[in-house]
Amino acid sequence: MNKARVKMVLLALLVFLVLIQIFQPARTNPSVIPSRSMAAHVPVPADVYTALTRSCGDCHSSQTHWPWYSHIAPLSWVITDDVNEGRRHMNFDDWEALADQKVANDRLIDICEEVKQKGMPPFSYRILHRDLRLKAQEIISLCAWSQSFRTSPPGIGFSPSHP
């Protein structure tokens, strides 16, 4: 490939990258209603709450901290999709969305397996946010708390009609 062709390809790529910035996804942080939150329905020890909000809250809450690179396409598309998927699966700030008590209980139990197997937080998040990685003691605390729901009746502490 000659130099002129390389320059043309690079220019076309640059123009493409600039043009795709027009198509930005909606990065939202819905209003938080405390009575709908997980903490209003499930007893959460302070150390577990701290670990969950710090290491999981960007995708599993309505209080996402959108970093600068989440405003640059195509990364913005991927990050927004990850956050929306995380919120759909389990949103700590909209616990009442898990209207089925068994589903809510199962999600709590699954937390331990996800963090032990390093499925959560995802690898890409852990790489970019080294300071937000779960520490060994936090994983132990999360698992002890999460697994306590195995012996509790489904939906313990969960009440869809909670005020």
Pin down the residues of each PLM region.
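A charge-rich, low-complexity, intrinsically flexible signal that marks solvent-exposed coils, linkers
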Residues: 29-33, 115, 153
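Extracytoplasmic electron-transfer domains, predominantly the class I c-type cytochrome c fold
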Residues: 77-128
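Hydrophobic membrane-insertion alpha-helices, especially the h-region
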Residues: 8-24
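Electrostatic cytochrome c docking/interface patches
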Residues: 31-52
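The canonical Cys-X-X-Cys-His
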Residues: 52-64, 120, 142
